[in-house]
Structures are given as C-alpha cells and as structure tokens.
Amino acid sequence: MDLVIRNGRSEHGQPIELGITAGVITAVSSPNTLPPAAQEIDAQGGMISPAFIESHFHLENALLWDGLINQSGTLEEAIEIYAKVKHDLTVEDIVARAGMVVKTAVANGTLWLRSHVDIDHIARLSILRGVAAAREAYRDLIDIQLVAFPQLGLAQNPEAVEMMWQAMENGCDLVGGMPHGEKTMDDAAKHIDIAFEIAQKYDVDIDMHIDETDDPYWHSLELLADKTVETGWQGRVTAGHCCAMSAWDDKMAARIIDKVKAADIHIITNAPINSMLEGRHSGYPKPRGIARVKELLEAGVNVVCGQDDLQNMFYPFGKMDPLEVALITAHLAHLGAPHEIEAAFNMPRYHAARMWGLYNYGVFVGAAANLVILEAETAVQALRQQPANRTVIRNGRVLTERKAETIWHMSN
C-alpha cells in the first residue's frame, strides 16, 4: 500500500483505518489491522470523509470587491456593476484570482468545482478563455467544470445565442441559462428551448440559474421540469437558486415540486448569497428568497448547496468552505433534527456527487481516494464545530494539512 490512514473514524463514528494504493481505496479495516505502508497518517480520531464538491460558483468575478461596492445590496445592481467591468478582465487577472480561490477551496477539502462562465455580447468569449486557462493551470489540484452562462438573456439576443454555441466549442462542459432574466414567461420558455437545443446537440447536461427572485410571478422552474421530461433529459438537469419558490403559495409549490421530482431535477440552494440579495425591495415581514429545502428533501428531490459568489459585488463574505455553506443552509432552511443536519452535511458531498455523476465517490474499497479528514466524529459535530484542522488527499496524494493550535496563557 502507498498510504495508510490510521486512527480514523467513519462518518458515523466507528473507528477505522484505510489503505490506499495507486490512488484507490483498497482497504477499509478495523483499527491496527493493516500492514505498514510507504506513508502513514494519524487521523487522531478524526472523521475520514469523501472530499467536498462546490457545485455552484463564479470563478471569474470572485474577489472583485475593491471599488465595486453594491450600495443597494440587490441582485440587479450587482449585475449592473459587473456588466461595466467584465470587458476589462484579462486572462492573467482571472487566473490569478482563481488561483487564490482554488487554493483556499482545496485547503478546506474541496476537490471538485463547477463554475458558471458569463457568455454574452459584452465579454463574448474573453471570460471563458480566462477561466479555461485557470482550469488548466490548477488541474493537478482540483477538477473544474465550466457552464456556459448567458446572464443577459437569449430570447431577444441572437448574438448571445451564437456565443453560446461557440462556448460549447471552446471548452464549456454544460449548458447554463437564466430564464427569469428575460422580460416575460414566454421569453423564459424560449430561453429554455434554446438551452435544450444546444445541450441535445452536444449531449451534455444542463445547469441553470432559475427564478432568482422573490417575485412569485416567476415559475420558470415549472417550464424547466416540463421541458426536461419532454426531451428525456431526466437526471441531467440542475436548477440553481429557485428563490421564487419561497414566494409561491403552498398549493403551487407542492404542484411544481412534484414536477421537479418526476423530472429528476437536482436543486442547488445558495442560501448565504440569496439571503443577502433577496428581500431588498420588501418591507416586513421580509422574504429571504430561500428555496423550500425541507419540502424538497421530504419529496425525495436531490438538494445540493453552493457558495455561488465570494467577496464581490454579489456577496461580500464567504470563506470557500462547504461546511460554512451547509451550516448557513441548515439555519435558513430550519434543518435542526439529526437526520436534517446529516442531510445538510451531505449536500456538498453525496448529494453533489449524485448530481455530478461521481459513482466512485465515497469511503469504500474501489473508490477513488479523494478525501478530507475532519476534526469531528459525526455530521452534527462537523457542522457545529466547523473544524479548522483538515487533511486533504487527492487521488491518494496528500495535498494539504492544516493544524490549528490554541495556546492558553493562564495558570489554571
């Protein structure tokens, strides 16, 4: 064996040790049973978890904060600010900022990242070139997927449609969309139709920003579900945000959730950013624009959580830590029972792996050795304590170790 991890625990608290050979888990054993290896790690009683997955992010505008302050705090102003500066972004700048993000993410235990890339008549393919260069630059640290994201619309923008086709020829892995950015539901339907046409041509999955508003008028999620079933794209479609769901009445929400389940659509909730952006136009009681996470989970829908933005005009905070995102999601979605906390913990892990189609993901013999060791014994502890100490392993190779220490300067 190349690597043995001793004195660890499974995510349910059982003492275990792992053997890894050629980047694959080849043994999951009870303590003190595996032979010596070329390299050994003492997990010190920590949980051996599969590494985290960041499923909804925007690499190109991460860390764009200085001088670009969103005074109103609204999504609309954030989009306006970004539209004014996106044409000035260089490949070198995007790669440099992406590197800071990637290194932070990896040190926190994230080994997969899906980034939406703005494709429009302003930036054309310049941003894609930058993010694609970043993907190549950091390929030894993290797997990055790129989503062609037409934030400024498709239905009335033939140039953007052409750019989307070109984006798929120039490195994008998935087709994105933002149908609620159109002016009417009819145009939203056209937007969705265009996205599916492109996805079917290239036989790729779809990941759209859906109903990122607290206006109950918007229900493009329903259109997306209908189109998914119509085209046979079940299991291959993801809907991010879904904020308007919180403004629908219960009957409407239940009907559309049933359609989402039937279409096997994955839902990504971006609780930190949407709780910051939504409700800005309302008095009290003030909506917070969070998808109905609990109802979706109860219906059997696969729910994932995502960071979305980091220290920019859309969101001034964030640590690129899926544990923080899961904790905030648990708060805002009222996930407080033990099984609900476990569901929140699984959102950037097993739920995300299902969305990505990572079938060799986990801690079992034959799985790829992509792991994070956490100073916690259970899901509840992981979310409560947000442990700083973490060891990150990619394909059987130790990438990072973080060891924080508290020093007491008191006699007792």
Predicted regions and their residues:
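Divalent metal-coordination and catalytic microenvironments
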Residues: 8, 23, 45, 56, ...
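His/Asp/Glu-enriched, well-ordered alpha-helical/loop segment
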Residues: 205, 226-237, 273, 277, ...
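Histidine-rich, glycine-flanked metal-binding segment
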Residues: 1-49
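C-terminal cap of metal-dependent C-N hydrolases
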Residues: 354, 365-412
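Alpha-helical scaffold segments that flank or form the walls of functional sites
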Residues: 65-116, 122-137, 162-169
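Active-site gating loops and adjacent loop-to-helix segments of metal-dependent hydrolytic enzymes
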Residues: 62-94, 171-174, 202, 220-238, ...
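Di-metal (Zn2+ and/or Mg2+/Mn2+) metal-binding site signature of metallo-dependent hydrolases
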Residues: 46-68, 213-214
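Histidine/acidic residue-rich metal-binding segments in metalloenzymes
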Residues: 126-140, 156-266, 282-305, 361
